[in-house]
Amino acid sequence: MAKDFRYLCYPYMRESVSTVDFEIRTDSLSTKIGLASSLTEHLPKVHDDLLYLAEMSYHLNGSVRGMTAIKEEDLNTLSQMYDRYVLEVEDRIQTFVLPQGSTAACVLHTCRSEAKKSVRALHKVSTEMKVENILFKYAHLLANVLFVMAVYVNKCEGIEEIPFVCKSYKDKI
């Protein structure tokens, strides 16, 4: 008798390994990147980049349990994307900024936060099994790309960044 998959949202849900948490995190990340793409249709390059990143975050997702799908070429593409956005917003990212602005920028900041959670989940996986270093590089860079994209979208929308000065660390940085 075939299993009825309507009662199973994810086949690995009952596993106790951290790989499952990483996969759920990166699924959430890809979903939020998809939301961000729907809010940036008026910015075609951002929209296209986000659709690409949604797909790549799923490749990152499967690269722990399965074959490593993230390759050096993918890391280079992401690095070039980062450089392209930094060139546009360099003057706006010299300080820590509040996650605010347009709805699209706020969703991109949420994506950035999800990417950081994915990095943390990947670290947890690495305490249980070997994780290719390229996956860490990609996940960290992805968070940074999403940050500069958020700032870029605010720039396109004519919204100024609001600097944040931390009272806890101001003498330590």
Residue ranges and their predicted role:
Residues 1-173:
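Phosphate/pyrophosphate-binding loop motifs in nucleotide- or prenyl diphosphate-using proteins
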